[in-house]
Every structure is written in structure tokens, then in C-alpha cells.
Regions:
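Outer membrane beta-barrel
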Residues: 27-165, 172, 181-183, 257, ...
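Short alpha-helical segments used as structural interaction elements across diverse proteins
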Residues: 4-5, 106, 256, 348
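Conserved positions at the start
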Residues: 90-92, 142, 175-177, 206-208, ...
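Loop-centered beta-sheet repeat module
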Residues: 157-205
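Outer-membrane beta-barrel pore domains
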Residues: 43, 48-51, 70, 98, ...
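Compositionally biased regions
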Residues: 21-22, 105, 150, 209, ...
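Cleavable N-terminal export/targeting peptides
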Residues: 1-31, 353-356
């Protein structure tokens, strides 16, 4: 398996070196390579729970290329190789047509348009996260129409993709997403409403509110994601995630951060149905990211450091965090004891830009 990964890396590097030469020497502006980069991340992890484990591992190795052609078209490709053994994944392979200064159309493999700033980050920039972030399969094939305001402070996107909850991409199941990215004074928004088909004709619905407050050296992020089916009695606050993060940049070389969150789903796997005067439990649709009966709490402190002044291509990071996962002991959702885990992490991220 490692030989296959090595061959892929060598072939990809050769291809990227060839493309970088094209980017440097190109004279025709009808086709441009505006970004051509590779990036990787290696971490040391120590985890202490019921057992203790530690080790050094490569987290991610990414290739990214984007640019434009024929004046009205742009493209983006990002290939992510998971160095922990789950293979290669295409995050982005999109083509955009910029029909007007206010309107564009994009199609291809893309992230589902779900609100929230934790969700919006590339995986290589996330250190510890909510249960929803860890479990949601966020990339799929689809198309979207985008509106851009004249002042470039607001983007509204309507997107249709394959349902990300089915492995069969020809099942006729879809996700419908509407998101607003806004810039209103100190506040940047990533608000969305989403309908995602989990079974034929059964949609889980999201209301996702991502808030990023910019106070100069300090950033405060608060995300709230509500999930549920409309036929559930407690559609609001029965199944949700709440995430908060504070970052303070002392200078351009050192940032401290504190982050925490809470995921909860108090819905049931079953609903009571009356048959011949008897109430009988019947299976019902449920959230696949934070399953019924689960409570998950996490919090931690960390830092980011850039050793080279004015250069963000090498980043050191570290954090200490805990998480507590409470799962139901059986299908009747009887509570189980907590599973408290502690995590200590140090790592380095590097980026090489062949074209800018």
C-alpha cells in the first residue's frame, strides 16, 4: 500500500512541476494557473482514555491548482491524500462560468453548502472539532448558482448535489442547499438552510448559523447547527451542535486559541404507532452524523506559530483538549457512562506555492 502511495506522490509531484513551468513561462493569458501548490501536515498525538496511545503520523497531503481560461471560466482542483490510510480523495474538481459580474454558475465535485465557520475550514486547518464535523461527509457532485453583490460583501448560493448520505450516486437522492456569506461590519456570516435526502423521500433539514466576529487581533466564532425532520415534535433544539472559538493574534507570528463545543441528539430511533389500540414502536428516520441518544462535549486550548516573519508557509501548532462522548447503552436510549478522553498534540504544516 505504501508503494502505491509513494508512486502516486511521485507522479503527482512530476505533474505539478511540469505545470508550474507552464505557469511561469505562459504568455497567453487566455489560460492561467493562478495557484499551484502542495501542502502537508504531520502531527504527534497522545491520547489518554480507557487506554493510552501515542504516535507520529502524517495527517494530510494536498495538491491544489486553480486558475482561469477564456476570460469567463475558472477552475479549481484539490486532491487530498489521507496519510492515515484511507486513500486519496477529491475535494474540489469544479468549473465555473462567470456569466456576469453578479452571477456565476459552478459544477463538479464540491463541498456541500452548509453554514458554519468550523465546517468552512479546510481539513488541514482543523485541530480538534465537533462530532458533526468529524462525521459529516461534506464533498459531493452537483451544481450551484451564485449571486455576488456589487460591493463584494455578500454571496448567495443555491446548490443541488447528490445526497451525501448514499454511496449509490445513481439512487435519485439529492441535497438542496441555500447559503448566505455576508460581511456586515464586524460580523461575517455563513448562514444556510439545507434539505438532504437520507432515504427516498425522507429529508433531514439543517438550519446552520455561522458567525465570525472580527475585533482586529481577536476573532470570535460562534456556530449553531440545528438538525431534524419536520415530523419530529422537537424539531428545534432536539438535535443540534453549538461550537465556539476565540483566537487572539499577539502578532503575525503567534496566535492563541480556545475552542469548545457541544453536540446533542435527544431524538429516538423509534416512534410510537398505534395498531389495534396498542402503541408499538416503529423505526423512524434519524440523524446519521450525531445519532439518537448521543451527547458529545469537547474543549481545548492551543496555539499557532509562524517561525518566519511575513511568511505563512510553515506553521507550528499545538493543543491540549478533552472530549466526553456519552452514547446510549441500548436501542431504548438508556444513558451510558461517559467516555472521557484527553488529547495532547504538536504538529507542523508546510506549504509550497509553485505559482501565485
Amino acid at each position: 500500500y505504501m508503494k502505491k502511495i509513494t508512486r502516486k506522490l511521485l507522479l503527482a509531484l512530476c505533474a505539478f512541476m511540469f505545470l508550474s513551468n507552464m505557469a511561469i513561462s505562459q504568455e497567453q493569458k487566455s489560460f492561467t494557473i493562478d495557484k499551484l501548490s502542495v501542502e502537508g501536515r504531520v502531527d504527534f498525538d497522545y491520547e489518554h482514555g480507557k487506554t493510552s496511545t501515542s504516535g507520529i503520523g502524517g495527517k494530510f497531503f494536498n495538491f491544489e491548482m486553480k486558475g482561469s481560461f477564456l476570460n469567463d471560466f475558472s477552475y479549481r482542483i484539490r486532491q487530498r491524500i489521507d496519510m492515515q490510510g484511507s486513500g486519496s480523495k477529491t475535494d474540489f474538481m469544479i468549473l465555473s462560468y462567470h456569466a456576469h459580474k453578479n452571477w456565476s454558475i459552478t459544477a463538479g465535485k464540491m463541498p456541500l453548502a452548509v453554514g458554519g465557520w468550523e465546517y468552512d475550514l479546510p481539513p488541514i486547518d482543523v485541530y480538534f472539532a465537533s462530532l458533526f464535523w468529524n462525521n459529516f461527509p461534506c464533498y459531493d457532485v452537483g451544481a450551484q448558482v451564485e449571486y455576488h453583490s456589487n460591493n463584494k460583501k455578500h454571496d448567495i448560493i443555491f446548490q443541488v448535489t447528490n445526497s451525501t448520505f448514499t454511496p449509490d450516486k445513481f439512487s435519485g437522492m439529492y441535497a438542496y442547499n441555500l447559503i448566505w456569506y455576508g460581511n456586515v461590519g464586524l460580523l461575517k456570516t455563513a448562514y444556510s438552510i439545507n434539505m438532504m435526502e437520507q432515504k427516498k423521500g425522507e429529508y433531514i433539514n439543517y438550519i446552520s448559523l455561522g458567525n465570525d466576529f472580527d475585533f482586529g487581533k481577536m476573532h470570535l466564532v460562534v456556530d449553531f447547527i440545528n438538525r431534524g425532520f419536520f415530523n419530529q415534535s422537537d424539531f428545534l433544539f432536539g438535535d443540534f451542535s453549538l461550537i465556539g472559538e476565540v483566537k487572539y493574534a499577539f502578532n503575525d507570528k503567534f496566535t492563541l486559541m480556545a475552542k469548545g463545543g457541544y453536540d446533542r441528539n435527544k431524538h429516538s430511533y423509534f416512534k410510537e404507532v398505534e395498531e389495534n389500540g396498542i402503541m408499538i414502536p416503529q423505526p423512524q428516520a434519524y440523524d446519521m452524523t450525531v445519532t439518537p441518544g448521543v451527547e458529545y462535549t469537547f474543549a481545548g486550548l492551543g496555539f499557532e506559530a509562524y517561525p518566519y516573519k511575513g511568511n505563512k508557509n510553515v506553521r507550528l501548532h499545538g493543543f491540549f483538549a478533552f472530549n466526553d462522548l456519552k452514547e446510549p447503552a441500548d436501542d431504548m436510549l438508556n444513558p451510558n457512562s461517559s467516555n472521557l478522553e484527553l488529547q495532547f498534540n504538536l504538529g507542523v504544516t508546510w506549504r509550497i506555492n509553485f505559482a501565485k
